[in-house]
Amino acid sequence: MSHSFIVGEDLFGFADTNWELVKRKRGELVDNAVAKGGNGEYMPDSEVSYNERQDITLVYRAKVKDAALAVALSLGLADPTSGYIPISIKANTKIPGHAEIEITGHKHGTGTHEVNSIDVSCTVDGWGATDFCSATADDGCQSGSWTATIEHSDKLSRAGDFFAGRSQACKIEVSGQYISDTAPALAADLTDDGSDIQEGDDFWTASLKAHKYLTP
């Protein structure tokens, strides 16, 4: 079965010698509003559709097993060809498995976004689990994720169409799972979001979450 629909859909220019585009999801979204009558009933003739927009998610998979692959993207900066604005990027890693990168974005048919963006980056191992949480990489790490999300605000015109938007604050969230009965020490630049310790029928596992903030 052919999957040629992916060709030419690398909208954020992320595919290269290390990363292959393997999945794409595109959605057409619209909001609707309808008035209610005095008895709480809907009045169908009043229904209005507004704020049409398109969302997209692209997934890339590492096609090499090399360690410390660079992952970098400018969140909030629209692709000049497609018009899509990336608002989040997530790295998922586990053992066994090759790393995957997921990028989500959106665009509108009208209006303009302010050109304010922030560069985000991390490094991942092409194969196996990357430890994004620990001060020193823990060999017992079984899975790790890293997510960068830029806060995005859209405003509508008086008729309900998209009018203007801007991106601003950026948050980095990380998580990891470890073969251990204690959570590892966090990297110095991270703030602890909590941990869970679980006893299984074979090994203890520790799960850890943390975050930090970036300024555009």
Regions found by a protein language model. Give the residues of each.
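Extended intrinsically disordered, low-complexity coil regions enriched in Ser, Thr, Gly, Ala
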Residues: 68-72
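Solvent-exposed edge beta-strands and adjacent loop segments
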Residues: 1-63, 77-106, 110-207
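Viral virion structural and adsorption modules
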Residues: 1-3, 211-216
